[in-house]
């Protein structure tokens, strides 16, 4: 069988050393496994620039979609409203998840070959103060587009979207 170099978001080509490590059976109760898990969790918190006494990282096994579903259904409360910026199949899948979970949402659809416009997001947020959360795919693999999360994130941060909702639950 021919060996291919897969330059795609997934499935990924892995090295023999990675494959060999994946063959090792780890017991979740072993101290070395727990130590590795804790290091990963601490590293994720560091990456997010947050502290262990305020946040935790939960490692999950599953597809990217299962991770998105977990976030949307655990972070967004019954009185919250979500704005989804979609420019591909994975952004649209967030709307499907929200629909099935009974999450109140609106969707800003952009063409598959265009990045969601931060100014348009600002206009949508200004027009609807009920929006408490904004979701957008960073790397929309259906089109190969890397969305400008910095620009959209600034718009969201400037309007303190999500902060009031989080404070109410604490």
Where are these regions (language model features)?
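N-terminal "arm"/small-domain region of PLP-dependent enzymes with the aminotransferase-like
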Residues: 1-31
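Short coil/turn connectors at secondary-structure junctions
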Residues: 1-3, 54-55, 78-81, 102-104, ...
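General beta-strand structural signal in soluble alpha/beta enzymes
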Residues: 6-8, 58-61, 84, 107-108, ...
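Buried hydrophobic positions in well-ordered alpha/beta secondary-structure cores of metabolic enzymes
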Residues: 10, 22, 64, 98, ...
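Generic structural signal for well-ordered, non-membrane alpha-helical segments
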Residues: 11, 15, 30-44, 87, ...
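Conserved N-terminal alpha-helix of the aminotransferase class I/II PLP-enzyme fold
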Residues: 21-70, 74, 89, 93-99
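PLP-dependent aminotransferase-like
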Residues: 66, 74-130
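Active-site phosphate-binding strand-loop segment of PLP-dependent enzymes
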Residues: 116-167
């Amino acid at each position: 069988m021919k060996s291919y170099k897969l330059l795609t978001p997934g499935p990924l080509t892995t090295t023999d050393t990675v494959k060999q490590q994946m063959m090792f059976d780890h017991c979740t109760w072993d101290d070395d496994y727990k130590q590795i898990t804790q290091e990963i969790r601490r590293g994720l918190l560091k990456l997010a620039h947050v502290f262990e006494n305020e946040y935790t990282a939960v490692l999950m096994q599953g597809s990217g979609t299962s991770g998105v579903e977990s976030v949307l259904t655990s972070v967004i409360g019954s009185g919250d409203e979500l704005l989804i910026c979609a420019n591909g199949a994975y952004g649209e899948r967030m709307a499907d998840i929200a629909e099935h979970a009974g999450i109140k949402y609106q969707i800003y659809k952009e063409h598959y070959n265009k990045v969601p416009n931060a100014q348009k997001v600002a206009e949508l947020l200004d027009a609807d103060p009920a929006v408490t959360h904004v979701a957008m795919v960073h790397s929309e693999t259906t089109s190969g587009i890397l969305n400008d999360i910095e620009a959209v994130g600034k718009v969201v941060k400037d309007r303190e979207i999500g902060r009031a909702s989080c404070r109410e639950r604490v």
